[in-house]
Amino acid sequence: MHLALTIPKILIRWLIYLSLASYFPWLSAQENNQFSLDQIINYIEYDAFYSSSGQVNEDDLEKLKEAGFNRIIYIAFNDPKRALLNEDKLVMGLGMKYFHIPVEWNNPELTDFMTFAAIMQVQPKKRTLLHCQVNYRASVFSFLYRVIYNKENMATAKLDMERIWKPNKIWREFIFEVLKSYQLSPDCDACDWS
């Protein structure tokens, strides 16, 4: 008898959930997309409009589109061994914008960052994924963008970057160069750059 009462309660709860999910589709889609997006290499969501990650695959692009992303920016080289073949066509075929800025691993340049920032500033509220191979380049660009343009706390942005990696000497110097060009210091209370 107890089982007979439990089944209708479960059924009622399930029907309520289904009716709410159909009325508010984001209830179920958001849970599924977030789980799916977390499967992308080193995926970090900084806010509702901006995320970074490592290399995506074709399935990831479809999940990103379903999750409401409008723009994909790729900042590594189109190496056939590591990059997604025809990523530009795949992204655009899904109705998203695609930008490619090949940033040299051993020689990132201020103009690379400025190009990225210019793309972001055209439509800052366009949901964007910035990615490279493993989210090393992208996490540095994200740190810089968040500090310079979003005026976020440097220590907080640095902690997010260090969830992925501690930048090596080349990338630390790049960070310092970019910050200096925007008249900002890399020094903060909780910032140890060693």
Label every PLM stretch briefly.
Residues 131:
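Short, surface-exposed ligand- or partner-binding patches at beta-edge/loop junctions that are enriched
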Residues 3-15:
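Bacterial N-terminal signal peptides that target proteins for export
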Residues 26-128, 141-194:
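Cys-dependent protein tyrosine phosphatase-like superfamily
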Residues 136-140:
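Glycine-rich nucleophile elbow surrounding the catalytic serine of serine-hydrolase chemistry
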Residues 5, 22-23, 118:
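Intrinsic disorder/low-complexity segments
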Residues 14-23:
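Bacterial N-terminal signal peptides
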